[in-house]
Structure formats: structure tokens, C-alpha cells
């Protein structure tokens, strides 16, 4: 995709996000669906679309660490833990951080923590940079169906009119690894 077409797709996606709606976009392994993390309306639409209970909590993806800082509490991290995290980012490793009381429950669910990732997918980086904040991100698939890996699969599951940022996944076969930022405990193998 040339930069002008990519810019148009990103601008269109931001318009949809500003309407408190859900978009689909390629990530490292599969297409994701996401929305504005600060909009309870948008997050509830995403959860309804995915038939996912709010208490499970969600993942935020960002262009850089600074975008994640308002949503997480990194004050307990040691220098070694920071080094470990930053050696994995940007990339397909998600870390679960303590969440401050100001992080909305529609993001954390029943937890006092939040899963976050700095993506290395250039299209998602550009999208988050243009939007100025992270996105809620979960795999693009309806309950019981496999995650979508192409624009056509997204349209087949969600409908032809569903807003999709066109692009390619990075070809990873597995979803992102998930680890505890403080303990390093592996929650999901990547």
C-alpha cells in the first residue's frame, strides 16, 4: 500500500474511532478488532461484538511506551524488569502491569492489572501515532470461529460494511505471548 492510500485508510479509521465505533486492522499474527480505550460506549460495543464478558479484561496496543503510561502503574518495576520489558518491545510480547485506580474497569475487568503491548506492526504503529493513544485490541473473530488473517475473512465474519484498515498481518502463527511485568510469569505462550 502506498503511503497516501495508507494515510487515507488511517484517517478513515480515526473517524470511525472518534464515532465510538470498532475497527479491524492487521496485527503481528491475525487481524485485531479495537476501539478507543477511553470510551466505555466503544468498549461495550466491542465486547458485545465479540460476545466477551467485561470481567475478563482487555489488552491495549500502542505505538510506544509513553502512550501506555496513563493506563498502567510502573512504579514497582525494577531496572532489570524494565530492561526485560523494553528488550521485547516493540514486538509480539504483551505484559500485564498493575493498573492505577484511574484505569477504567471496562478495560481491567475483574483485575487490578492491565495487559499492554507496544506493537511492531508498522500500520498499527502509524494508526496509534495518528490517533494519539493506544487501542483496545483483541482478535478479530466471532465467538467460536477462528481469528481472521485477511481482510476477506474479516468481512466474511463481520460483514462487508465493517470498517477495516487494509493491510497484511506480519505472518506470525501464534498470538502474542503474555507475561506478568513484575514476576515474568508466563500466562500465554507466544
Swiss-Prot record:
Function, in words: Required for the formation of a threonylcarbamoyl group on adenosine at position 37 (t(6)A37) in tRNAs that read codons beginning with adenine. Catalyzes the conversion of L-threonine, HCO(3)(-)/CO(2) and ATP to give threonylcarbamoyl-AMP (TC-AMP) as the acyladenylate intermediate, with the release of diphosphate.
Pfam families xref list: Sua5_yciO_yrdC
Record NCBIfam families: PRK10634.1
UniProt keyword list: ATP-binding, Cytoplasm, Nucleotide-binding, Nucleotidyltransferase, Transferase, tRNA processing
Residue ranges constituting the YrdC-like domain according to the UniProt record: 7-190
SUPFAM superfamilies recorded: YrdC/RibB (SSF55821)
Top EC group: transferase
TM stretches of this protein: none
Cell compartment(s), UniProt: Cytoplasm
Protein name in the entry: Threonylcarbamoyl-AMP synthase
Predominant cellular place of this UniProt entry's protein: cytoplasm
Record has Signal as a keyword: no
GO molecular function: ATP binding; double-stranded RNA binding; L-threonylcarbamoyladenylate synthase; tRNA binding
Amino acid at each position: 500500500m502506498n503511503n497516501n492510500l495508507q494515510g487515507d485508510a488511517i484517517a478513515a479509521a480515526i473517524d470511525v474511532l472518534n464515532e465510538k465505533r470498532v475497527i479491524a486492522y492487521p496485527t503481528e499474527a491475525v487481524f485485531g478488532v479495537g476501539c478507543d480505550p477511553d470510551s466505555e460506549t466503544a468498549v461495550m460495543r466491542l465486547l458485545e461484538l465479540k460476545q466477551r464478558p467485561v470481567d475478563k479484561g482487555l489488552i491495549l496496543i500502542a505505538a510506544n511506551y509513553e502512550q501506555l503510561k496513563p493506563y498502567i502503574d510502573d512504579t514497582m518495576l525494577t531496572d532489570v524488569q524494565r530492561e526485560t520489558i523494553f528488550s521485547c518491545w516493540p514486538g509480539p510480547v504483551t505484559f500485564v502491569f498493575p493498573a492505577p485506580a484511574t484505569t477504567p474497569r471496562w478495560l481491567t475487568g475483574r483485575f487490578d492489572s492491565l495487559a499492554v503491548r507496544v506493537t511492531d506492526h508498522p500500520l498499527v504503529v502509524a494508526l496509534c501515532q495518528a490517533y494519539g493513544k493506544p487501542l483496545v485490541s483483541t482478535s478479530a473473530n466471532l465467538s467460536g470461529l477462528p481469528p481472521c488473517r485477511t481482510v476477506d475473512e474479516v468481512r466474511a465474519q463481520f460483514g462487508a460494511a465493517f470498517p477495516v484498515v487494509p493491510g497484511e498481518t506480519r505472518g506470525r502463527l501464534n498470538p502474542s505471548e503474555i507475561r506478568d511485568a513484575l514476576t515474568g510469569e508466563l500466562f500465554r505462550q507466544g
